Regions:
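S-adenosyl-L-methionine
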Residues: 1-243
Length: 243
């Protein structure tokens, strides 16, 4: 599904040699690079040449974000809300917090369950995105942001997704179903739903301690990336007009 799988690790943690890590003095740059690395375009760049692992030589040739780009705060907010899952990231959140975060919003407002800009300078348990549909939307918008920042068109981005990420494309259309509350529906529930359709019972829609409420949806990643790209392009043009 993916080759380049980034994560921001907090201070005091360790990892085996199979994981390559980078660091630096400026955590805003580190966070921006993590956001870039989570995009489909950088994953495509990383897998372009045969390799047994992802080490410095691979990472060094990947494109990096411009630290003066007007869309950088949007990239930082989505990356931070995806990665800052516990209070171990509280210092990172405080250091990277930008007042513009509070005026940011999703490109598809009625899709996510959590307002994007509903954050403050201090990390709380409400800071990270935890619901599956919210995390998916943040990744889709990061894909659009990175493409726009690199001068890649929305059509080119969608072509990369459709032709180079066949497994993800298949999951998006056949496996990744979200319930009415934005939770990812587990396979054991989907198997029954495929047989019985909307006639699936409440007991059959219950797994572990969760009841997954109908209707179940898949989402069109290509359409969502197009919408996000056009909206970020509009915001960028508006910012240029206002400045």
């Amino acid at each position: 599904e993916r080759t380049l799988i980034p994560a921001i690790i907090p201070p005091g943690t360790a990892h085996p040699n199979g994981v390559f890590c980078v660091g630096g003095a400026d955590n805003r740059i580190l966070t921006a690079c993590a956001g870039f690395a989570s995009s489909l375009l950088l994953d495509f760049s990383a897998r372009a040449a045969p390799k047994s692992g992802i080490y410095q030589a691979v990472f060094d040739r990947l494109p990096a974000p411009c630290q003066r780009h007007p869309l950088l705060p949007a990239l930082l907010l989505r990356t931070l809300r995806l990665n800052c899952l516990t209070d171990a990231y509280a210092d990172l959140w405080a250091e990277c917090f930008d007042p513009s975060f509070t005026s940011d919003s999703w490109t598809i407002p009625d899709r996510a369950t959590t307002p994007l800009g509903d954050v403050g300078p201090t990390w709380t348990s409400q800071t990270p995105l935890r619901r599956a549909v919210d995390r998916r939307q943040a990744l889709v918008e990061i894909d659009a942001l990175v493409a726009l920042m690199l001068g890649i068109t929305a059509d080119q981005l969608c072509t990369v997704y459709r032709t180079q990420f066949a497994v993800l494309y298949g999951y998006d259309h056949d496996q990744y179903f979200y319930d009415a509350h934005g939770r990812l529906v587990p396979n054991q529930v989907l198997k029954v739903r495929r047989k019985k359709g909307e006639a699936i019972t409440e007991a059959e829609r219950t797994a572990t301690t969760y009841r997954y409420d109908l209707p179940f949806h898949t989402y069109d990643r290509e359409l969502d990336m197009h919408i996000a790209y056009v909206e970020f392009e509009r915001r960028l043009e508006t910012r240029g007009t206002d400045s």
